[in-house]
Design a protein with these regions (language model features):
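Short, low-complexity N-terminal intrinsically disordered segments enriched in polar/charged residues
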Residues: 1-32, 137-143
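A beta-strand edge to alpha-helix "cap/lid" segment located at domain peripheries
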Residues: 2-4, 55-143
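Short, mixed-charge, low-aromatic patches
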Residues: 5-15, 38-41, 62-66, 117
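Hydrophobic pocket/interface hotspot
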Residues: 12-15, 25-27, 34, 50-53, ...
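General structural signal for secondary-structure boundaries
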Residues: 20-21, 46-49, 107, 124
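A solvent-exposed, acidic/Ser-Thr-rich amphipathic alpha-helical stretch
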Residues: 23-77
Length: 143
């Protein structure tokens, strides 16, 4: 890995920490023209669109904690792919990536000028497995 890769990993780690703690200064990590993608939210443009996306969880997300020690970082030039798991509680129900259907994710970061220019988050937003009708293979799977 080159120095730039290490800097991008450092920024991504800081993003997960600040986001999990609900810190408003998470926005400082984003470029002012950042692009955000999240399932069911779609695309947002500008760093404040991150807050717009987060507002969709108000009143239901009690907490989220990414498993920092289990994050896999795949750097490539201006991009950093991060695969991992999270745990949390939403509307009184808990999830834990690797143990429940929800909680696995993959984030694609793109950097410009030392900031997050693009963040695309790929996951199933049904963290707690409420959408039982679409568990076509049953719930007795290895997660």
């Amino acid at each position: 890995m080159v120095a730039n890769d290490q800097e991008q990993i450092k920024i991504a780690r800081e993003y997960f920490t600040r986001a999990d703690q609900g810190r408003p200064d998470v926005l400082e990590l984003f470029h002012e023209d950042a692009e955000i993608y999240f399932p069911k939210f779609g695309f947002g443009f500008g760093r404040n669109s991150f807050l717009e996306m987060v507002k969709g969880f108000e009143g239901v997300l009690e907490y989220i904690q990414h498993d920092y020690d289990r994050l896999n970082f795949i750097p490539s030039a201006d991009y950093l792919i991060v695969e991992g798991t999270s745990q949390g509680r939403m509307s009184g129900k808990s999830w834990a990536g690797g143990e429940t259907p929800g909680g696995r994710f993959c984030n694609a970061f793109k950097f410009r000028d030392g900031r997050i220019m693009s963040l695309h988050i790929y996951l199933d937003p049904d963290y707690t497995g409420e959408d039982e009708a679409r568990f076509r293979w049953g719930k007795n799977r290895k997660w």
